[in-house]
Amino acid sequence: MEYKASGKIAVNDFVREYTIPQAVEFIDKYSPDILWYDADWSEKAAKLGSYEIAAYFYNVSEKPVAINDRYGLGEPEEIAGKFTKERPRQWLRTVRGDFYTDEYGDTSECINAENYHPWEACRGISQSYGNNWQDDENSVLSTKEFVALFADIVAHGGNLLLLVNLDGQGSIPEIQMQRLKEIGKWLSLNGEAIFATRPQAPYTKEGVSYTRSKDGSCAYAIISEPKSEIFLQLMPPKGAILMLLESKSRVKWDYAKNIKGEPGIKVGLPKEAAESKLPVALSVKMK
């Protein structure tokens, strides 16, 4: 079956006379770092021209590039034996592409320590991928919710692709602009716990998301619900320095066990941090 389309330039085969040439032109003109497909539910990849486009992209690129997982329905040999009731068809995204993608989903499904695959969470600040003029404080992520979500994604080894919903004039709605400024302020003070970090077991547990520096010399704990005393499932060396990133002030700690008998440390937060309306981040020297 051919895709027929009419328009300024009539074509008989939409994929091979229009889609593939347009993709090639785009790749040649803009030299993208990523091709982000979004067609994994309609047709098989071969019918959509996905393989031809991917091959061209990889072959002409003179830098590291990546393609996501949504390049078409799976071929029989690709999906054979991969799906059960517990692993439905959408799990094909976890076994293909340079990175797989998740929409408004549960990040706990997106990491497997034994078989990790790069992944990306995709969502808007609001609950829609388009502009909703009715968005208000109840329909968009609060700054606290966003920071906790972002920390959880990074702690699970993921990237966040955040959509900003422009209005009909191409402007950022005020409520979303406010969120971006608040998020930016938090990251300016606590970004060390987010950027260029790696996942740190136990990833996210009991409201705390864990990351670490690339060289492993420092671990980070992002606490979504601050209080005066926090248990962290980390085992720093004796005398290690723990510091609040926002204020650069040291905090007191001691070895302890939680109610399950799991080893870790008990941390005392100062009053200002304990009463914070936003998550707080700690750095923990591990070496």
Labelled PLM ranges:
Residues 1-287:
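Mature catalytic domains of secreted/periplasmic carbohydrate-active enzymes
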